[in-house]
Amino acid sequence: MPSILVILGWRFYFYANEGNEPIHVHCRKADAEAKFWLDVGGFAVAEAHAYNMSPTDKRVVRRIIFEHFDYIVSEWQKFQRRRDGKGT
């Protein structure tokens, strides 16, 4: 479960065992957590699920994802290549 960003107390990370799911990122801060899908072609973010997050928390996380969208996508792609044994 590599962490790729820690901003404003939010840790953004991936899981290695999620099969062939589309690009997404998990985030956690204290007892709040969520998963967001990233639509690369449409430069869009959609909430997959959220637990114990206020509307403000969701807005903050979405803003962080948009501000680091290209970086998250790049890290996702590198992570998947390493996981699949295809190098960096």
Regions found by a protein language model. Name each.
Residues 1-12:
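Negatively charged, low-complexity tracts enriched in Asp/Glu with abundant Ser/Thr
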Residues 4, 15, 26, 59, ...:
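Alpha-helical interaction segments
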Residues 13-15, 51, 71:
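Sequence-level detector for tyrosine residue identity
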Residues 17-55:
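A short, structured beta-strand/loop element
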Residues 55-88:
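C-terminal structural segments of small proteins and small subunits
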